[in-house]
From Swiss-Prot:
The keyword Cell membrane applies. It comes from Homo sapiens. A lipid is attached at residue 65 (S-geranylgeranyl cysteine). Belongs to the G protein gamma family. This is Guanine nucleotide-binding protein G(I)/G(S)/G(O) subunit gamma-7. The lineage of its organism: Eukaryota, Metazoa, Chordata, Craniata, Vertebrata. One of its GO terms (biological process) is G protein-coupled receptor signaling pathway. The modification N-acetylserine is found at residue 2. It is a lipid-anchor. The modification Cysteine methyl ester is found at residue 65. It is found in: Cell membrane.
Length: 68
Protein backbone atom coordinates (compact mmCIF):
# COMPACT_ATOMS: atom_id res chain seq x y z
CA UNK A 1 0.00 0.00 0.00
CA UNK A 2 2.87 2.38 0.79
CA UNK A 3 4.40 1.83 -2.64
CA UNK A 4 1.04 2.62 -4.25
CA UNK A 5 0.79 5.84 -2.24
CA UNK A 6 4.32 6.83 -3.22
CA UNK A 7 3.58 6.24 -6.90
CA UNK A 8 0.36 8.24 -6.70
CA UNK A 9 2.14 11.11 -4.95
CA UNK A 10 4.94 11.04 -7.50
CA UNK A 11 2.42 11.20 -10.36
CA UNK A 12 0.66 14.16 -8.76
CA UNK A 13 3.99 15.89 -8.28
CA UNK A 14 5.02 15.27 -11.89
CA UNK A 15 1.67 16.60 -13.13
CA UNK A 16 2.02 19.73 -10.98
CA UNK A 17 5.57 20.30 -12.22
CA UNK A 18 4.40 19.95 -15.83
CA UNK A 19 1.71 22.55 -15.22
CA UNK A 20 4.20 24.93 -13.62
CA UNK A 21 6.73 24.38 -16.41
CA UNK A 22 4.12 25.45 -18.95
CA UNK A 23 3.49 28.82 -17.31
CA UNK A 24 4.80 31.76 -19.31
CA UNK A 25 7.33 33.70 -17.28
CA UNK A 26 8.69 37.22 -17.54
CA UNK A 27 11.71 38.85 -15.95
CA UNK A 28 11.22 40.55 -12.59
CA UNK A 29 12.61 43.81 -13.98
CA UNK A 30 9.95 43.80 -16.74
CA UNK A 31 7.17 42.96 -14.28
CA UNK A 32 8.33 45.71 -11.92
CA UNK A 33 8.44 48.34 -14.65
CA UNK A 34 4.99 47.28 -15.91
CA UNK A 35 3.60 47.48 -12.37
CA UNK A 36 5.09 50.93 -11.78
CA UNK A 37 3.73 52.15 -15.09
CA UNK A 38 0.26 50.84 -14.24
CA UNK A 39 0.37 52.49 -10.80
CA UNK A 40 1.44 55.83 -12.27
CA UNK A 41 -1.30 55.72 -14.91
CA UNK A 42 -4.04 54.92 -12.38
CA UNK A 43 -2.80 57.02 -9.43
CA UNK A 44 -5.32 59.80 -10.04
CA UNK A 45 -8.18 57.32 -9.48
CA UNK A 46 -6.73 55.71 -6.35
CA UNK A 47 -8.72 56.74 -3.27
CA UNK A 48 -5.79 55.87 -1.00
CA UNK A 49 -3.63 58.47 -2.76
CA UNK A 50 -6.10 61.27 -3.54
CA UNK A 51 -8.65 60.66 -0.81
CA UNK A 52 -12.40 60.28 -0.98
CA UNK A 53 -14.55 63.41 -1.23
CA UNK A 54 -16.67 63.88 1.91
CA UNK A 55 -19.83 63.94 -0.19
CA UNK A 56 -19.07 60.48 -1.59
CA UNK A 57 -17.74 58.85 1.59
CA UNK A 58 -20.32 56.28 2.76
CA UNK A 59 -18.53 55.84 6.10
CA UNK A 60 -18.64 59.48 7.18
CA UNK A 61 -21.18 60.24 9.89
CA UNK A 62 -24.12 62.19 8.54
CA UNK A 63 -24.87 63.82 11.91
CA UNK A 64 -22.58 64.54 14.84
CA UNK A 65 -23.12 62.71 18.10
CA UNK A 66 -25.70 64.49 20.28
CA UNK A 67 -24.20 63.28 23.56
CA UNK A 68 -20.88 65.03 23.01
Amino acid sequence: MSATNNIAQARKLVEQLRIEAGIERIKVSKAASDLMSYCEQHARNDPLLVGVPASENPFKDKKPCIIL
